[in-house]
Amino acid sequence: MAPVCVLVGPPGSGKTTVGQALAELLGVEFRDTDLDVEATAGKPISEIFIDEGEAHFRALEREAVAAQLASATGVLALGGGAVLAEQTRAALVGHTVVYLSVELPDAVRRVGLGAGRPLLAVNPRATLKHLLDQRRPYYAAVATATVVTDGRTPEQLAVEVAALLAA
């Protein structure tokens, strides 16, 4: 089994929102590895960062990604930093991976400058810019397709991704 597609991208790119709309459009299940991590840990990601640290969160994230790549059959959204792990990038080979690209102004507007996002807690705009700059090459490297999300609704994006999948 394999997911219909895997969505990757930075915070604010719309992975969860677009993923839910896409899954509904395709009539398949939607999974978000961030939610899987929270279920495994029994607490929100922000608390995992505070209590156990980012390294522990990333280990849980790698496990969640590996499990979902092996079992998910619908649309799978990965956490924004999942592609930083070489193990995850290697596991994505052979999957249909859609990179939801977003520029800083739209990302800032969508994430609300750090609400519930531990990596954006201090100087969120500068941190988000750094994350975008740091991670873009990783998203591009794993992607089989890229969709620009700026100024578009989740429904418009879901239709575009569905068309890419059908092509």
Curated annotation (Swiss-Prot):
Name by which UniProt lists this protein: Shikimate kinase
Its biological purpose: Catalyzes the specific phosphorylation of the 3-hydroxyl group of shikimic acid using ATP as a cosubstrate.
EC number: 2.7.1.71
Cofactor(s) of this protein: Mg(2+)
PROSITE patterns to which the protein is assigned, alphabetical: SHIKIMATE_KINASE
A Pfam cross-reference name: SKI
Sites where the protein binds ATP: 12-17, 117, 152
Subcellular localization, as worded in the UniProt entry: Cytoplasm
Uppermost EC category: transferase
GO-annotated molecular function: ATP binding; magnesium ion binding; shikimate kinase activity
Cofactor binding mode and count: Binds 1 Mg(2+) ion per subunit.
Binding of Mg(2+), residues: 16
Reaction catalysis annotation: shikimate + ATP = 3-phosphoshikimate + ADP + H(+)
Residues reported to bind substrate: 34, 58, 80, 135
Keywords: Amino-acid biosynthesis, Aromatic amino acid biosynthesis, ATP-binding, Cytoplasm, Kinase, Magnesium, Metal-binding, Nucleotide-binding, Transferase
UniProt record similarity statement: Belongs to the shikimate kinase family.
Cellular compartments per GO CC: cytosol
InterPro entries listed in its UniProt record: P-loop_NTPase, Shikimate/glucono_kinase, Shikimate_kinase/TSH1, Shikimate_kinase_CS
Subunit structure, as described in the record: Monomer.
Pathway(s) annotated for this protein in UniProt: Metabolic intermediate biosynthesis; chorismate biosynthesis; chorismate from D-erythrose 4-phosphate and phosphoenolpyruvate: step 5/7
A biological process from GO: chorismate biosynthetic process
